[in-house]
C-alpha cells in the first residue's frame, strides 16, 4: 500500500486535529494538519501473522449507530448481521431499542483481525445506497465532513467512503493519539483514512467517540492496528468501575419532537426582533429550540423548525409564532390603511392586538411583555 505522503500532490485535504488530548501542544496540531489524504483504496485485508493481536487476545469494539443504521446492519430477518457473524466467527449484536432513544450500540467481540474485518463489512453495508440523515442527538452527527470531489474524482468510488463512530475510553483515545500525536499521524498516513476524537464525553459516561472515515477495507486495517495499540498499552479491557455509555431514553430528552412552519420571508425580521431578542425570548419561554432555514422556498417562505422535549412545548411555540405573525400582518395592514386615510394607527388598536396573542387564553395580568421598538409588533409570553 502506498502512503498518503506518496500521493499528496493529488489531494488538497487536510487532516482534522480536533483532539483535545494534544491541544496543550499547538505545534503538534499544526504538524498534524499538514498531512494530505488521497483515500487510497485497499483491496485486501492486511493479515500480519506476527502482530500481537493474533496471539490469542480478544477485543471488543462498541460502535455508536443511529436507528436507521442499526436496521441496515441487521438486515431483512437479521440476515445481514448473521452473515457478518458467520463469515468472521465473532460475536456481534446490537443493543435493544430503547423507547424515545435515537441511538443504539453495535458490539463486536473476538480476535482483533476478525473484529476489524467485520467492522469493515459493517461500513460497506452502511455505505450501500447511503442516504444522509439529520440527527437531533448531537453525538450521532459526523464530526468529519464528507470527502470532497477533489479528493475522489470517481463518483462511484466517492460513494464507498464512509464513517464509523467507535466508542472509546479516555485511556484508549490517548493510546490512539500517542506522544505529540505521533500515533494518530502514523495511522492516518499508513491507512489513508481520517481520524478525529470528540472533545467531550458521551452522556453519563467517561466514553468518547473516535470517528474513522475512509474506504471499508482501509478502515478495517486501521481498526486492526488500533486494536494492537490497545493491547500493547493494556487498555483493551476498560475498568469495571468506569461509567460506560449505553443508550437510554433520558439522553434524548434534550430534543424529541419537531414541527416546521413556513413564514413569508418579509415577516422573518419582525418575528426575530431586534438583535434576535424576540425569538430568543420565545425560545426561552417555551423551552424549545427554533432553527430558521437560510434559503427561501420556491414560494418565498423561510422554514422555521421548532424542536422540543414534548409536543406541548412545541405546540406552544408554534402557536405563539403564528399569532405573532398574525399580529404583524394586522399591524402592517392598519399602517397601510392609516397612510391612505392620512391618520395614524390608534394606540388602542395596537394595545388590542398585543393582548390577542396571550398564549393558552391567559389573563392579561399574567403576561410578560417584551420591549417593542417602533418597527416591531408586541409579543406577549404567558406564565
Curated annotation (Swiss-Prot):
Q: Specify the domain of life of the species encoding this protein.
A: Eukaryota
Occurrences of domain KH (ranges): 58-122, 161-226, 256-321
Bias type Polar residues, positions: 363-376
Q: Which GO terms describe its molecular function?
A: RNA binding
Q: Which GO terms describe its cellular component?
A: chromosome, telomeric region; nucleus; P-body
What subcellular locations does the record give?
Cytoplasm; Cytoplasm, P-body; Nucleus; Chromosome, Telomere
The record's annotation in PROSITE patterns points to: KH_TYPE_1
Q: Where is this region: Disordered?
A: 332-383
| The keyword RNA-binding belongs to this UniProt entry's keyword annotation | yes
Q: Which InterPro entries match?
A: KH_dom, KH_dom_type_1, KH_dom_type_1_sf
Q: Which UniProt keywords apply?
A: Chromatin regulator, Chromosome, Cytoplasm, mRNA transport, Nucleus, Repeat, RNA-binding, Telomere, Translation regulation, Transport
Q: Where is the composition biased (Low complexity)?
A: 343-362
Kindly give the SUPFAM superfamilies that the UniProt entry links to this protein.
Eukaryotic type KH-domain (KH-domain type I)
A Gene Ontology biological process term? chromatin organization
What the record says about family reads:
Belongs to the HEK2 family.
Query: What is this protein's function?
Result: RNA-binding protein involved in the correct localization of transcripts in the cell. RNA localization is a widespread mechanism for achieving localized protein synthesis. Involved in structural and functional organization of telomeric chromatin and regulates silencing at the HMR locus.
Subunit organization: Binds RNA.
Record PANTHER family: KH DOMAIN CONTAINING RNA BINDING PROTEIN
Q: What is this protein called?
A: Heterogeneous nuclear rnp K-like protein 2
Tell me the gene name.
HEK2
Amino acid at each position: 500500500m502506498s502512503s498518503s505522503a506518496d500521493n499528496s500532490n493529488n489531494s488538497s485535504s487536510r487532516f482534522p486535529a480536533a483532539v483535545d488530548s494534544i491541544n496543550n501542544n499547538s505545534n503538534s496540531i499544526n504538524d498534524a494538519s499538514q498531512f494530505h489524504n488521497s483515500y487510497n483504496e485497499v483491496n485486501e485485508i492486511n493479515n500480519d501473522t506476527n502482530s500481537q493481536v493474533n496471539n490469542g487476545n480478544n477485543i471488543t469494539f462498541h460502535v455508536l449507530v443511529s436507528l436507521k443504521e442499526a436496521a441496515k446492519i441487521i438486515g431483512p430477518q437479521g440476515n445481514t448481521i448473521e452473515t457478518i457473524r458467520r463469515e468472521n466467527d465473532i460475536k456481534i449484536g446490537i443493543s435493544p431499542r430503547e423507547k424515545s432513544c435515537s441511538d443504539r450500540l453495535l458490539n463486536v467481540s473476538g480476535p482483533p483481525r476478525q473484529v476489524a474485518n467485520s467492522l469493515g463489512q459493517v461500513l460497506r453495508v452502511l455505505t450501500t445506497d447511503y442516504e444522509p440523515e439529520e440527527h437531533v442527538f448531537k453525538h450521532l452527527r459526523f464530526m468529519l465532513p464528507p470527502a470532497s470531489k477533489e479528493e475522489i474524482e470517481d463518483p462511484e468510488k466517492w460513494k464507498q467512503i464512509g464513517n464509523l463512530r467507535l466508542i472509546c475510553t479516555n485511556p484508549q483515545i490517548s493510546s490512539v493519539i500517542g506522544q505529540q500525536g505521533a500515533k494518530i499521524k502514523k495511522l492516518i498516513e499508513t491507512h489513508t483514512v481520517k481520524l478525529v476524537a470528540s472533545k467531550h464525553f458521551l452522556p453519563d459516561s467517561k466514553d468518547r467517540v473516535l470517528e474513522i472515515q475512509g474506504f471499508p477495507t482501509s478502515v478495517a486495517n486501521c481498526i486492526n492496528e488500533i486494536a494492537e495499540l490497545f493491547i500493547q498499552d493494556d487498555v483493551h479491557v476498560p475498568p469495571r468501575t468506569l461509567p460506560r455509555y449505553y443508550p437510554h431514553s433520558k439522553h434524548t430528552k434534550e430534543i424529541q419532537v419537531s414541527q416546521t412552519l413556513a413564514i413569508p420571508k418579509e415577516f422573518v425580521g419582525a418575528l426575530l426582533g431586534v438583535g434576535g431578542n424576540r425569538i430568543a425570548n420565545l425560545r426561552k419561554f417555551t423551552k424549545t429550540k427554533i432553527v430558521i432555514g437560510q434559503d427561501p422556498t420556491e414560494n418565498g417562505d423561510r422554514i422555521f423548525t421548532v424542536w422540543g422535549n414534548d409536543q406541548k412545548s412545541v405546540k406552544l411555540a408554534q402557536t405563539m409564532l403564528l399569532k405573532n405573525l398574525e399580529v404583524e400582518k394586522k399591524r402592517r395592514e392598519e399602517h397601510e390603511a392609516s397612510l391612505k386615510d392620512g391618520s395614524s394607527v390608534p394606540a388602542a388598536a395596537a394595545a388590542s392586538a398585543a393582548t390577542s396573542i396571550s398564549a393558552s387564553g391567559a389573563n392579561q395580568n399574567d403576561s410578560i411583555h417584551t420591549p417593542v421598538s417602533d418597527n416591531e409588533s408586541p409579543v406577549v409570553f404567558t406564565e
